Amino acid sequence: MPVRFEIGAPIVPNTIVYGGSAIRVGSANFTSGAVATNVADSSNVKKLLVTAGHYVSLKDKCYPIKGTRPDTDTLLGTVTKVQYADGKYGDYSLITLGSDIEITTNTYERPYELTPLVGGYYPKDGDTLYKFGRAGNVAKITFQEANMSVVMPASSSGSSTITIKGMMIGKIEDGISTGGDSGGPVYYNSSEGLKLVGFVSGTTSTGTNVYLTFTPVSRVTGCGINYVD
């Protein structure tokens, strides 16, 4: 089921959606990680938005954030898949966009110019990665480990925890990640151009060190990825 992932710039009012945009999903402020086109059935093409899955429920509505508040007059779409449960792999959700919502070409705002996204990438130990979030902007990360099990709050109240499997982790070297960055893209700046690695989940700390946890693209199941050169 091939899907084209794209990451980009802020939302243009009413019609166009990019990755890397500030969005409200249910009661959570997130960053969109990528837009995707499900082209498995040419007679029923679905436009999707990929973001984080924590604190999200099926059928939650998604709106763009304008300034500091959601624009509830502009419905982008509805959550149709959530992956965030104890013992499961990855932290993400898929939002099916309305038929009137347009998606963009294969570009990403980093953060002041549109740059092509040339494919996906599975990082090696020590690789320099970058995350983008609408709250914390760009942060530089040193990749450390894949296939991690991460303990996270079961709900926004934080009264209990669950374990999410199959996550990646990297040490934040420069910049920050904060509330509102969840779901945003993590990428690798290769000699060929930017390559998508995953989607922001959260942070954890050890002493003075802060680490970013993120869902690798390979954990977004049920879809193939078709990058546009």
Region spans (language model):
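Autoinhibitory propeptides
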Residues: 1-13
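Serine endopeptidase catalytic core focused on the charge-relay Asp
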Residues: 17-163, 188-189, 201, 227
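Alpha-helix initiation/capping motif
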Residues: 1, 52, 213-216
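C-terminal subregion of chymotrypsin/trypsin-like serine protease catalytic domains
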Residues: 187-229
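Glycine- and charge-enriched low-complexity intrinsically disordered segments
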Residues: 165, 169-201
